[in-house]
A protein has these predicted regions:
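Glycine-rich phosphate-binding loops at beta-strand->alpha-helix junctions
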Residues: 195, 217-253
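Glycine-rich phosphate-binding/hydrolytic loop that grips phosphoryl groups
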Residues: 109, 229, 247-286
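Small-residue (GG/TT-enriched) beta-loop-alpha framework at ligand/catalytic clefts
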Residues: 7, 13, 68-173
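Thr-Gly-centered strand-to-loop micro-motif
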Residues: 23, 145-147, 225
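Adenine-nucleotide phosphate-binding core of ATP-dependent small-molecule kinases
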Residues: 173-221, 228
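Active-site neighborhood for divalent-cation/phosphate handling
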Residues: 14-114, 221, 251-257, 273-276
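Feature representing long, continuous alpha-helical segments
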Residues: 158, 194-197, 201, 205, ...
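Phosphate-interacting basic helix/loop segments used at nucleotide- and nucleic-acid interfaces
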Residues: 1-5, 117-121, 202-210
Length: 286
């Protein structure tokens, strides 16, 4: 915090991965008071953890507009030890953890701020981190499907490291377009493309599962965010596979940036990797 000059006392963080579960539940219509009383019992049927090991949150996304006496509820559950780990880092930095969100939802907040999406358009948000990729599929601004994949930018680094017998740091340098002694960036392009093919294959499997388990038959738009979004060749591989132009997420697309304080080139360089952070910054303490 001192290095970056962050002065805010309250911090929002996002969690994802195996310790986080998001489920859509279809329940009989009931009052908020009744739902508050029954949510723990309902949650036990959907999450693979002991109920006392998790923190729960939920939101009703449809109810009054349904004619079948049912309501849709989004349930988010995160293991307490995961939350404690993230919160502990904030506390160690002398700040207060005010909000713990789910990465997929923070990404959606940033999308709603920066992109206008028609109700009939199905959009896949893909956030590629170092070790985990978060996918949130939406119809308009309504979330339909979420999945975390245990793949990310480290797959590229590890492949380069293994193929060329390099250190992790040298492999990272090459992955990001640099060169190391005796090895040019051009020589690692085939490795990057091979990993991109594998990674995109996992994305497509997720899309096919979504289409097979929902009423939606197409993905109309794809926005790619995260620190790995701009890896050489990935955007083109994904574009070729899905048959339409994939977009790199711009977290500052609709945000006015003071160019006297922030270098526009730097802002552009970080615009895809800061999508989650921008989404978190929009959150209000509950």
């Amino acid at each position: 915090f001192e290095k970056t000059g962050v002065k805010n006392s309250k911090i929002a963080v996002a969690v994802a991965g195996n310790g986080v579960i998001i489920k859509k539940m279809l329940l009989p219509q009931m009052s908020m008071e009744e739902l508050n009383e029954s949510i723990r019992w309902e949650a036990e049927q959907y999450i693979p953890f002991e109920i006392d090991e998790v923190n729960l949150d939920y939101e009703i996304i449809s109810g009054d507009d349904r004619q079948d006496g049912q309501m849709e509820v989004i349930l988010a559950a995160a293991k307490k030890d995961v939350i404690s780990e993230y919160s502990g880092v904030v506390v160690q930095g002398g700040r207060e953890p005010a909000v713990v969100d789910v990465t997929a939802f923070a990404l959606q907040n940033a999308c709603e701020l920066n992109y206008s999406v028609a109700d009939e358009v199905t959009t896949a948000l893909i956030n590629i981190g170092a070790a985990t990729t978060n996918i949130n599929i939406m119809s308009g601004n309504r979330s339909l499907f979420w999945r975390d994949l245990s793949i990310g930018g480290n797959y590229y680094t590890n492949a380069i490291q293994k193929e060329l017998n390099l250190s992790f740091d040298d492999a990272e340098t090459l992955k990001r377009g640099g060169s190391v002694e005796g090895i040019s960036f051009e020589s690692v392009i085939p490795i990057l493309n091979s990993v991109s093919e594998d990674m995109v294959g996992e994305f497509l499997k997720t899309f096919e599962f979504f289409k097979a388990t929902s009423q939606y038959s197409n993905i109309d738009r794809i926005l790619v965010a995260g620190g790995t979004a701009n890896i050489y060749g990935l955007e083109q591989v994904l574009t070729d596979k899905v048959g339409f132009k994939v977009e790199i997420f711009n977290a500052f697309k609709e945000i006015e940036v003071n160019e006297n304080m922030f270098d526009p080139q730097f802002v552009n360089e970080i615009s895809s990797m800061t999508a989650t952070a921008v989404g978190l910054a929009m959150r209000k303490e509950m």
